[in-house]
Structures are given as C-alpha cells and as structure tokens.
Amino acid sequence: MANLRKTHPLLKIANDALVDLPAPSNISVWWNFGSLLGLCLAAQILTGLFLAMHYTSDIATAFSSVAHICRDVNYGWLIRSMHANGASFFFICIYLHIGRGLYYGSYLYKETWNIGVILLLLVMMTAFVGYVLPWGQMSFWGATVITNLLSAVPYIGNSLVQWIWGGFSVDNATLTRFFAFHFLFPFVIAAMTMIHLIFLHETGSTNPTGLNSDADKISFHPYFSYKDLLGFAILLIALITLALFSPNLLGDPDNFTPANPLVTPPHIKPEWYFLFAYAILRSIPNKLGGVLALLFSILILMLVPVLHTSKQRALTFRPFSQFLFWLLVANVAILTWIGGMPVEHPFIIIGQIASFLYFFIFLILVPTTGLLENKMLEWQ
C-alpha cells in the first residue's frame, strides 16, 4: 500500500512541495532565502497578531497603546521589538533573494518572477502602512509625505489624496484604515506566496551553473529541509540578538515623540530599507517625474526578463556581466546612503548620478554586455 503522504489529498500537496520535491543537487546557500522569507512572514504574522490584541488604532490612544504594550503587557517589549526588527530582516532576505534571482537568471521563469515583483510591492506597502501605526513624529510625517505623492497624478491627484486620507489631512480616518490594511495585506502576501510556489514547482529551481539539472536531482527532504533549518536557526539567532541587545538601532529617534501636525521633523526619511527608492524619488526636481522614477525603480524588475540578451542564463561564466551586477549592488548601497542624507551639496549630485546609473545599468549596460559576451563566444 502506498504511503499516506502520497495518497491523502492534502498531505499529497505538502509532500510534493516539501518532501519528494526534486531539487538540483548543487543549489547553494543563496537558494535558502525563499524559505527564510516564509519564516519571516510567519514570524511577522504571529508577532503582529499579538500586537494587534493590545493596539488601538485611534490617534488619541495609538502612541500610548504602543507604550502600554512595551511596559505592561507580558513580554510586550519583546514582541514589539521582534516585529519591528523582523521587518528589517524581511527586507534583508527579500533583497538578497532578488539579488540571487538577478545573478543566476532565475527571472527567466517569467510567471514566478513577476509574481515575486508583485510580492515585493505588497511587502513594501505593508511595511509603509505599518510604520504609520505607532503614530510617532516620523510615522505621521512619513505618511503625510508619501501619501502626498499621489497628488502628482494628473487631474485626479488631489481627489485621490483626500480619498486615501479620508479627510483633508492625515488624521484619525487615515490611521484606522492603515491599521486595517496592515492587518489584511500579510494574508494577501501569504496567498500570493502560494501562487509564487505553484509557478516555481511547474519548472523547478535553477542552479548556480545556469544549466539544466534534470540529470542530477535529489529529494528536498532530508537534504534541503535540514539546510533550511540551519538557515532558520541563523536568522532567528540574528533577529533575537538584535531585538534583545539593540532593538532601536535601525529605528528613528523622532518616532519616540508623539505625532504633532504643527512641528515638522528636521529630516523626514523612511526606514533604511526604503532609502534607495527615496533617494531616486528626491533626485528628480519634478514631483510627477520623481513619483514615476520611484515607481519605475521597482517595476524595472519586470523588464529584466525582456532585456536578457545573453545565450547563457546565469552570470557564473560571464565576468563582464558579473562586474555590472556588483556595480549595481554598490550603486544601490550608495543610493541607500544618499537617501538618509540631507538635501544639500554634494549629496544632491551624487544621488542624481547614482539614480541615473541605476536605470542605465538595467536598461542599457546589461543587454549590451550580454550581446558583447555572445559575440566573444563565437569561434572564428
């Protein structure tokens, strides 16, 4: 008689995804980040659920309720710290996961890749509305600045902003709906993750060579299930260490001050994981242009499969394209630094050069280099 896990309608799905899944024998640690993102999502939903039990989404009590969680709720300080820093680890994993996809040509699985980009947008939206909830100074002014960007939409801009706000400024209605969105989105993300995996399992994973690995597959369990568990342990140790030893390292001190519409903080800036996009937004002196650049800085990922000109999939055997990849990584690091700096010389011009280079690498240099490398492979 066949094993129950292979015949039971529900267990069969889990078995095909987690036990008997054929995986390439040579996938490296860079393939761990998908499962780590799943762990991050589960941890965020769990800690978020416990926070939501004690949080109140009203401007009169939101800030106090967060203070109450940290002071009076059993291990509330830990739950909040894990949730806030968990978001940072979520983005570390997501950026490494995308970097892996770009380096090894995973984007050629177009459905999986495009759903991944939609997932990135959903996670970014969730993080944004979540940052508003503690109702500190940076929460309030961050919400004001970013929602105001919608006013750049021609003709309907102002109506759109007031519709999002639920009034004529960021107020109680805004906070309440942002809490509703922040509660809802993670479950939408979980559903989209399932679709992401369904499309991935249609084709199977890529591998570091970029070659077809059908001839050399191993089962997911026990090999990669244990490899994933090691990743889980490392991530959780790192997260707990940060949450216990320096929980406010990545936060903004301005958010310890309750929101005040009459006092603008000297430097309005988002959390570190949005700084690269914020730098691109600020580097264009026109409002609509900046908003479009901000949007396109993420959506450009959807163009990557179209701009793939090389005969090889991965960058493993393509030194020139490898150089461009690391140039892009360095460029994003520079943008992240610039996003946290005040708008003054020389940061303005550095930001503008880095923003130009960001799009130039994706749209011009990568496809051209792919064609060049194809030419170099021709035997004469």
UniProtKB/Swiss-Prot annotation:
Heme b b562 binds at H83, H182. GO terms for biological process: mitochondrial electron transport, ubiquinol to cytochrome c. It is found in: Mitochondrion inner membrane. A ubiquinone binds at H201. Heme 1 (or BL or b562) is low-potential and absorbs at about 562 nm, and heme 2 (or BH or b566) is high-potential and absorbs at about 566 nm. It is a multi-pass membrane protein. Belongs to the cytochrome b family. GO terms for molecular function: metal ion binding; ubiquinol-cytochrome-c reductase activity. Binds 2 heme b groups non-covalently. The chain crosses the membrane at residues 33-53, 77-98, 113-133, 178-198, 226-246, 288-308, 320-340, 347-367. Its cofactor is heme b. Keywords: Electron transport, Heme, Iron, Membrane, Metal-binding, Mitochondrion, Mitochondrion inner membrane, Respiratory chain, Transmembrane, Transmembrane helix, Transport, Ubiquinone. This is Cytochrome b. The lineage of its organism: Eukaryota, Metazoa, Chordata, Craniata, Vertebrata. The keyword Metal-binding applies. GO terms for cellular component: mitochondrial inner membrane; respiratory chain complex III.
